[in-house]
């Protein structure tokens, strides 16, 4: 009986210790950004000048392997933040990123699609309940109030204020985010790496919301687009491609179902670059008959489908795993196949 009681006490103590350990882990998030390992290197003594006994004759000195003295001002040990930098995301069609210590920018093609970008940004901030402390409609600039970032890797959440602006120049529209202050609790943060991290976080919030709006608008347009006209064409180098007489957003949203209906399974797609990865396995003769077209001679396998934005039209180019586009004959066959597939997907 004594042994059983002792075992029970040990199990209770072990269970209590586990609860305390898990509670500590759940409240202290520093382990997510700190080095986990041996820190004895921090106790390495500094280099000293070699003491030479009197009367000893030394070989000629060669400074090739001298270790230069250096003063390190960076963080070490537990103070070193091992988290990778945040990646700014180019989520919008035709967008690219320009990142610096001062600001994070989303660069867009100056097309009609982004003609209302400023009003979309203002609407998005309101939707996310981000308060605006100052706004200049004419200059298309604003300053947000303090925004709190609740993150699992910070014990005390950061708060940031941001300058947000939209500008047009020549062929380019720019959405820019820069810091107007960053703090953690009551402590002002001036570390450039932290400021850049939270600039990128804010830009990604805006890009993500705008991308969702773009996707929803494209889906609504696709519902009303009806049958699409498809024809054969060629790119600037003379290689065969397919031209669809519909805007990029419409074609992009209609493609998944159309491709599936002709035996092409979409394995990956990236809207901002217009890239779609597909695996072609063909269809049965009865399926092709139901679609109203003859079976194309395109070989089964993996293809990259590159979708191009030609304003009120879109281009499609299939590229094989070996980097070769379709032949003119194969391309012409796919024109008929896709036109039939798009006509079947008008209500999707």
UniProtKB/Swiss-Prot annotation:
Its main location: membrane. A lipid is attached at residue 25 (N-palmitoyl cysteine). Keywords: Cell outer membrane, Lipoprotein, Membrane, Palmitate, Signal. Residues 211-230 are annotated as: Disordered. It is a lipid-anchor. Residues 1-24 form the signal peptide. The keyword RNA-binding does not apply. The keyword Protein biosynthesis does not apply. One of its GO terms (cellular component) is cell outer membrane. Part of the outer membrane protein assembly complex, which is involved in assembly and insertion of beta-barrel proteins into the outer membrane. Part of the Bam complex, which is composed of the outer membrane protein BamA, and four lipoproteins BamB, BamC, BamD and BamE. Belongs to the BamC family. This is Outer membrane protein assembly factor BamC. It comes from Xenorhabdus nematophila (strain ATCC 19061 / DSM 3370 / CCUG 14189 / LMG 1036 / NCIMB 9965 / AN6). The lineage of its organism: Bacteria, Pseudomonadati, Pseudomonadota, Gammaproteobacteria, Enterobacterales.
């Amino acid at each position: 009986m004594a042994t059983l009681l002792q075992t029970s006490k040990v199990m209770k103590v072990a269970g209590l210790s586990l609860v305390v350990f898990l509670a500590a882990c759940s409240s202290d998030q520093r382990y997510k950004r700190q080095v986990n390992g041996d820190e004895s290197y921090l106790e390495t003594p500094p280099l000293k000048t070699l003491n030479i006994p009197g009367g000893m004759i030394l070989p000629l000195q060669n400074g090739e392997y001298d270790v230069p003295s250096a003063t390190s001002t960076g963080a070490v040990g537990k103070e070193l933040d091992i988290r990778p930098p945040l990646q700014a995301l180019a989520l919008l069609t035709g967008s690219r990123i320009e990142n610096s210590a001062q600001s994070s920018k989303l660069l867009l093609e100056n097309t009609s699609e982004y003609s209302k970008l400023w009003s979309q940004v203002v609407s998005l901030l309101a939707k996310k309940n981000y308060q605006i402390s100052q706004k200049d409609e004419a200059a298309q600039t604003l300053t947000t109030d303090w925004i709190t970032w609740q993150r699992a890797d910070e014990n005390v959440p950061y708060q940031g204020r941001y300058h947000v602006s939209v500008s047009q120049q020549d062929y380019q529209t720019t959405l820019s985010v820069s810091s107007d202050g960053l703090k953690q609790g009551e402590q002002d943060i001036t570390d450039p790496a932290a400021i850049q991290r939270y600039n990128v976080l804010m830009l990604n919030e805006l890009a993500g919301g705008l991308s969702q709006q773009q996707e929803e608008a494209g889906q609504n347009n696709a519902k009303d687009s009806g049958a699409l006209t498809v024809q054969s064409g060629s790119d600037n180098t003379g290689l065969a491609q397919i031209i669809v007489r519909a805007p990029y957003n419409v074609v992009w949203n209609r493609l998944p179902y159309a491709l599936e209906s002709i035996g092409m399974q979409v394995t990956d797609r990236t809207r901002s670059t217009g890239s779609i990865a597909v695996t072609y396995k063909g269809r049965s003769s009865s399926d092709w008959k139901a679609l109203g077209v003859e079976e194309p001679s395109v070989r089964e396998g993996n293809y990259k489908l590159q979708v191009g934005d030609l304003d009120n039209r879109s281009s499609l180019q299939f590229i094989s795993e070996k980097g070769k586009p379709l032949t003119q004959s194969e391309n012409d066959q796919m024109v008929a196949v896709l036109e039939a597939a798009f006509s079947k997907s008008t209500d999707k």
